[in-house]
From Swiss-Prot:
Protein's UniProt keywords contain Plastid: no
Membrane topology term: Multi-pass membrane protein
InterPro entries noted in UniProt: UPF0259
Coiled-coil positions: none
Protein's recorded name: UPF0259 membrane protein Ent638_2284
Taxon lineage: Bacteria, Pseudomonadati, Pseudomonadota, Gammaproteobacteria, Enterobacterales
Family, per entry: Belongs to the UPF0259 family.
Amino acid sequence: MSITAKSVYRDTGNFFRNQFITFLLIALLCALITVVLGHAFSPSDEQIASLSQGDNLAGSVGLFDLVQNMTPEQQQILLRASAASTFSGLIGNAIMAGGVLLMVQLVSAGQRVSALRAIGASAPVLPKLFILIFLTTLLVQMGIMLVVVPGVLLAIILSFAPVMLVQDKMGIFTAMRSSIKLAWSNMRLVAPAVIGWLLAKTLLLLFAPNFAVLTPNIGAVVANTISNLISAVLLVYLFRLYTLIRQ
């Protein structure tokens, strides 16, 4: 039986709609974790404010020039802020991916699952998911920085890796290699969904500053929750598609 993207989209939409409250709670919990961790590890407001102070920054052209003209103390503050944002984002994404994939797995097996149970059930795979998401994010970002297209291609061919790691309990690099082979042979079914996910994430980044009117922390939680829901839709699609391909 041939698999069509339309049938998988419809299946994904029905599943997401039926389990929307659980998805929303997982997305919200992970957004809160991301924001709280980011706030806990970030420099203080006074230190952040100091990044824009000093005559040494006047006349800087571009981000690279700006960083070069910073004092060592300012560079340390910027590095700490970047590390806090990256680390908290990776933790939140790993928990969200694990929770969503375990929820889909359990619901597909006929079990009733709450958001907390799904996240709790994902605990054993979270360390591997964290490393996997770190590696794939690094590769995709490097590809996008080069010419954009390599980054998009990497995002497509590595998209099955989290599903394989959770569903088949593969190792990190085995999941990445298997994902490349499977996604490449099913490019017409995978590429549109991943490209749509990337476009949705990009649009959210463009509108994210508007959420700051709700206060920075609340705005960050709202933006992260929406971002998590977008990722949840893609994960459900990839899980359902992977299940159909294996049949």
